[in-house]
Amino acid sequence: MNKLIITILLLVAWSGLQAAVTTTAPSGKTGCLSCHDGIEDIRASDSPMMIQIKAIGTGNGDPAGCVTCHGGNPKGTDVETAHKGSPEGLKNGNGPQDFYPDPGSVWIADRSCGQCHIDYAYRVERSLMNTEAGKIQGNLHTWGIAEVQNHKVPWGNYDVKDTDGQVPQVGSAEYKEYMTAMIAAHGDQFPTELTQVPQPSVEEIENDPKLAGFTYQRQQCQRCHVGIKGREKRGDYRGMGCSSCHIPYGNEGYYEGKDPTISKDQQGHMLTHKIQATRKSKIKHGDVEYSGIPVETCNSCHNRGKRIGVTYQGLMEFPYGSPYNAQGGKQPKLHTKQYLFISDDLHHQIDSRPENPKGGLLCQDCHTTVDMHGDGNIFGTTLAQVEIECQDCHGTTEQFPWELPLGYSEEFAKDLPQTERGLTNDLLPETAAFATTYDKREGYLKTARGNPFGNVVKDGTKVVMHSATGNDFEVPLLKQLKLDDSWKSPDAMVAMNAVAKHNESLECYACHASWVPQCYGCHVQVNYGKDKDGKPYQDTDWLAGGSIRDEHGQTAESPLGTHGLKSPGKVFETRSYLRWEEPVLGINGEGRVTPLMPGCQIVYTVMDRNNKVVALNQLGKSLDEQQELGQERVPDAIDMAPVQPHSAQRKARTCESCHNNPKALGYGISGGVFQTRYPVDIVEDLIDQKTGQVIPGRHVIQIPKIADLDYDWSTIIKDGQQTQTVGTHWPLSRALPQAMRDGMERTGLCLGCHREMTNAELWAKVSTPGTLTDAEHIEMLNKLLKTYAASKK
């Protein structure tokens, strides 16, 4: 198939190129290489892709192939003439229309990458990687913006329409049927068009301060989409569009290749002029040869919001920067933050199971082309676009992956088919054409939505995942663990097998994600006044900059050092506190029990053009959540969001950490008994201890109040009612329902026995000398259960 594609592309490239062919072709060190001599071939010189690029380049006067992707004038003798225009053959065909500094830019990618990777640019432009529609909806909901209530998704980063209908462009027949039904059932999460996030005037914001949420959105939250180059900060350097992922950038942003025209001292450049992709796309850099897309590439964006990228690496931001480094300073900031190492996801860890090689998984090893590029539809949230579930590879204790029905573990309250999903012998055409292909053995496994996993195969009694790193991993199958009785511990057997409801109702990571980054209280000040120099506050507006595009595919912030366009106002942020342990549990959009994390617990303060406060420590309200829940209390719009945190551990949460933990159940840390005085100002001075009156006449408020916050930030249930929003995207997401909490909660179990310790006669009969170990205690309880059961005969 690759040979067929190359042949077709060469025919296309050579058609209509008579003018270019009859001119004298540059040779030696002429053309692009007269300046860029030494630059790395974008792919290995003997790869089909590089052969193709150079063949097209030769037909357009550039044997090095630069013009194939970049355009430009290969006859130019200086930067002004060389970096202008494009060979007529390419302009008249489907190639570059002008010089493209970054051919990956999504705004011109249909004329560069899209020459071969047809329709990818269309798909990516409508994917969450570019629209960020879900992030926008969720964040603005926390400000109390009415237009995004009731799960509506009206806005994206830019105006965009789904012009080819809602049947996916790509995917298997099963996938297309599955998604068509899903779109029909959940139309709000698959909008047919988006308009750009509005930018209210400062006057409008002063009259309605919650509209400052739009400033916050445009200046802070929207820098991580592929339509722009992003922030010039350590760890955030990247390209645009396709280059965001497929061109390597080091965290320091230095070029370490051999092109003499690219500065080695200026930050913000690619690491090397290479494409990183799948296993076959190997990159040799210094002493390291690697393949695949490193996790840190993904983290140039996935370090805020749900923080799943840095969490996967085991990192959680913290404010201290300890320990000190060799120069006596604090650790350097990464993504503008400093980090504490907790524990990386088991799939990321270098040490693996005994039967597997050393090495962790890359994001792309699990996530599919649809997850990352989209399928041509517009998605309103992550659960709409991502098609994979843990059970797709691991199965359950009762069923191997291929025995599960499609839709397993993302039920969305629908009945699942009774038929097995099976295996498939067929790859997606896109995978077969461009990715590394692997022997299907007995067949490729399928995703929950029916697409083939091109890198995961059934091989006899085993499932093998082929990682883009070059490693092949045997995947543990839960049913095989049960058949072999090879459980690592009794806890695992009980949690995954004995308690059937766990399989039916829980996400795997409800237990295995034993830590989650929890940033409680997002205190945001948006200031439209003047700074200390008397200048009006303003900051980079990522959407304003991304909306200005030139013929070269560049946006306003693309040239290094420009920092894009600015809009009025400046955002200042802080928080209440951070935690990682024992995350709260709730229900996600699929209807399963999942960890929750503070999604955006916005408490906003807004200052007008005269530096006067027009809104102080305000909370939005979720009238839509109140209506869905049918409760009297109106939940605050601050969000505890359902999340797949990407922090899975081999040792899962203990039974007690959920069943004997008020926080996990939603009642707050230690049952919500702490931090209960937010609704009142706290003054710390000389106090009349009889009355609580402040004695000095001149005193200040130590801790200003948050008037509507009558609970601890981690509390989502108070007096039987939900206190804050739990997810904004799907009708099913909410706190654990009362019946489930009642079935789970086992706090106070110790009293069942130990309240009788003062009954000397009884306790003498059941106690033993010394102290029981934990294991002995469990055995004692087991004996009691069996004795009780025997008494029922």
Region locations from a protein language model:
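N-terminal secretory signal peptides that target proteins for export/translocation
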Residues: 1-2
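Bacterial N-terminal signal peptides
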Residues: 6-16
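Mature N-terminal segment immediately following signal peptide/propeptide cleavage
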Residues: 20-47, 56-62, 125
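Solvent-exposed helix-loop boundary motif
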Residues: 33, 41, 67-68, 75
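Primarily extracytoplasmic ectodomains and periplasmic/lumenal surface modules that are beta-strand-rich
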Residues: 40-41, 74-75, 118-123, 517-518, ...
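Active-site-surrounding "flap" and adjacent substrate/cofactor-binding loops of secreted or lumenal enzymes
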Residues: 51-74, 80-94
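Extended surface/linker regions that mediate inter-domain or inter-protein docking
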Residues: 81, 85-93, 99-505, 547-769, ...
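Long, well-ordered mid-to-C-terminal structural blocks that present hydrophobic/aromatic surfaces
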Residues: 437, 507-564, 568-569
